[in-house]
């Protein structure tokens, strides 16, 4: 939505507006989610003494029984609300999807001041724990998808997380200095 895109265009002099813009963007997504054909639940994932905001998205027209599920992590400046659209086709194909503002992203960054961290297997494990705790999720069919910066974090999570059955690491760039 426009509030999300306005964040990209803010100058350093307008830094104080980021939290307000984020909150409006989040409010817009949550209002639209109520109209979505598949259920989108607002959830929190606990990790140590921190809580991360996110969404558990139900598949559209799910088959009977437990659902396969994917944890979808966005890049360095991504919001859970914006990456929903990149994963929507998984919902259409019968997968559940967990979107979480892990450290350094979305509400963790803008509303809670939680910065990113190098040991991403820790928040990654907390997210997988949450997914597997859901009775409708098939614990034997859990995948992780990381895009952009999370395309680097996702393999680290997978290296420590043996419950994952699939990994997609869609990294941003190979060498940022070469790509500039």
Mark where each language-model region is:
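Hydrolase active-site cap/lid region
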Residues: 159-180
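Active-site glycine-rich loops that stabilize anionic/oxyanionic intermediates
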Residues: 67, 72-78
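The serine-hydrolase catalytic nucleophile loop
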Residues: 76-88
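Residue in the alpha/beta-hydrolase core beta-strand immediately N-terminal to the catalytic nucleophile
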Residues: 101, 141-143, 166-168
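Alpha/beta-hydrolase active-site loop
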Residues: 114-140, 156
């Amino acid at each position: 939505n426009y509030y999300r895109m306005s964040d990209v265009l803010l100058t350093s002099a307008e830094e104080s507006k980021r939290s307000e813009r984020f909150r409006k963007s989040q409010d817009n997504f949550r209002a639209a989610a109520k109209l979505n054909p598949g259920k989108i639940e607002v959830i929190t994932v606990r990790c140590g003494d921190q809580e991360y905001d996110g969404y558990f998205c139900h598949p559209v027209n799910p088959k009977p029984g437990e659902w396969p599920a994917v944890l979808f992590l966005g890049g360095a400046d991504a919001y859970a609300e914006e990456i929903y659209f990149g994963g929507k086709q998984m919902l259409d194909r019968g997968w559940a999807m967990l979107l979480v503002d892990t450290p350094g992203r979305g509400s963790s960054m803008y509303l809670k001041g939680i910065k990113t961290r190098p040991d991403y297997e820790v928040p990654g494990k907390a997210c997988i724990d949450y997914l597997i705790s859901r009775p409708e999720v098939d614990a034997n069919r859990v995948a992780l998808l990381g895009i952009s910066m999370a395309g680097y974090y996702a393999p680290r999570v997978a290296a420590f997380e043996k419950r994952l059955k699939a990994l997609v690491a869609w990294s941003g760039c190979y060498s940022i200095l070469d790509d500039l």
